[in-house]
């Protein structure tokens, strides 16, 4: 029997061990998509206790605590941090096979030097150890980033954001890690939302544009894109129900938008036509600016109305949406490609059954502009577990070029989540090592070592051009 999460954790062959320890492990991290609050980096936040780091905004953990029958007061309510940690520890011991079990223990090992198992009985010991460690200077937000060997972080930012915290970080020469904004303009697209007109007023203020037409909406966004670009932004991100394509004329789009500006509701057909026009218009802008476009789709959000009413979005009540016609995604990409205005694009579906569809679609739109211009994104959200990563990389290898894959991202709100890169690299090295062990690829250490280093870091550096 193997030891619990030792140095060869998840590395089943000699080649896998060699590739990870001698090549992948030492590579830096380029975290091109996360939800970390830049204010916490600017102010170099120190955390009072492990609950603040682990449970403050982690809806992955909240879901499992609810699944364990934990009262909401111990999850997002007014229970003490020690009580919340106890409930999490009692939940974690039941999470065999869940990535949260592995992530949590990798974090305990790497940042706190704890190699035991966290459960209800050890909670007090771990609580005291972690909290003592968190008082050290080396455990501040910036130092956690430094010790994780991170070179660059892309946060997730709305077009109306001031980016003041990014400015403060950039002006501080004592912090060598680049922290750049990433453009997330979902609120300007979601005209079906009840607060849409309120949002447009905010966009008018920051852009200086009177938004009285679809054309003026795009102009306001273009001005904000220029502002983001001045702050180093070259990455966009969209959260979509699915990648739709319902084309309409300019006149039809203007009529739909005018109806919404009057405070009237729009039909589902109108909504899809508007969103299509919006995504095509922004895709063209990204191509002009040489930005990378990320499309996250296949989500049905905020399903539990009672919890949503109390906590709002990002509360752990989202699920997979299995309606995502690949034909419409292909048509959307083609609408940009046919006029040579398709930017570098990364496609992420929450539904693992979309892996093969994505793999075939990206092969239709590659070009000499970049190696792997159109990427299948790393296994995302409910898929960033051992099996999900294996399935995503295997599908990509079956249908494309795994050697050009840009690899992992944290997609997290926590400064301890960089161990997800280690988790990914171990799984990736084990997958490749297994193919070599099985005689499916030559045991050429030089070629293989370069490949795993590229997937771990170098491909992302080349692709994004930071």
What are these regions (language model features)?
Residues 2-289, 341-343, 347-359, 363-466:
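Metal-cofactor-binding active-site regions of metalloenzymes
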Residues 270, 316-320:
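Metal/cofactor-centered catalytic core regions of large enzymes
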Residues 299, 304:
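Hard-cation-handling environments
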Residues 308-316:
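Short glycine/proline- and charge-enriched loop/turn segments
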Residues 323-329:
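Divalent-cation-assisted or electrostatically stabilized phosphate/pyrophosphate-binding catalytic cores
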Residues 332-338:
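Short, basic/hydrophobic alpha-helical segments
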